[in-house]
């Protein structure tokens, strides 16, 4: 078992906190000193109280799911002796009312596009199976109620990449 943490810092400054006219911008700091500007989503709290250039919790949630999936996929591909050259994804999360009537991130769809090289290329079915296994192993996906879908995008670099699955 391991513990994971982060530091968050928000300062009011001279803002009108009691009038609900204050910036939601804050800093996230992670081990190693990486700092990320964070804010509420402009879809939730209007600009200028939100900073659209900063990462919002909803984006971070979607990115965490996609990142975890990526890391597991790479590990699985390496163990199966498939050489991955690149992995790109543009995951999309949908905020909607859940079965309890509460706003929640109800679906996150991953759309990974993976390029392989070498003499041993996976078939589309093997790629789909590796994504399925990556999802099953992902700690973040195993920690949430959100439906996580994976819709791989096939391009050059898979065996028989012209096959639709």
Give the role of each language-model region.
Residues 1-63, 71-165:
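Extended beta-strand/beta-hairpin segments
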């Amino acid at each position: 078992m391991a513990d994971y943490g982060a530091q968050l810092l928000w300062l009011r400054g001279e803002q009108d906190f009691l009038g609900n006219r204050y910036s939601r911008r804050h800093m996230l700091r992670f081990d190693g000193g990486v700092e990320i500007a964070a804010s509420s989503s402009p879809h939730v709290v209007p600009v200028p109280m939100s900073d659209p250039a900063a990462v919002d919790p909803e984006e971070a949630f979607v990115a965490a799911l996609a990142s975890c999936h990526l890391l597991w996929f790479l590990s699985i591909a390496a163990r199966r002796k498939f050489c991955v050259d690149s992995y790109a994804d543009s995951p999309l999360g949908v905020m909607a009312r859940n079965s309890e009537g509460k706003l929640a991130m109800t679906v996150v769809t991953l759309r990974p596009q993976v390029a392989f090289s070498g003499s041993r290329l996976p078939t589309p079915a093997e790629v789909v199976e590796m994504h399925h296994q990556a999802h099953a192993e992902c700690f973040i996906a195993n920690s949430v109620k959100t439906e996580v879908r994976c819709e791989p995008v096939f391009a050059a670099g898979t065996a028989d990449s012209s096959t639709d699955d």
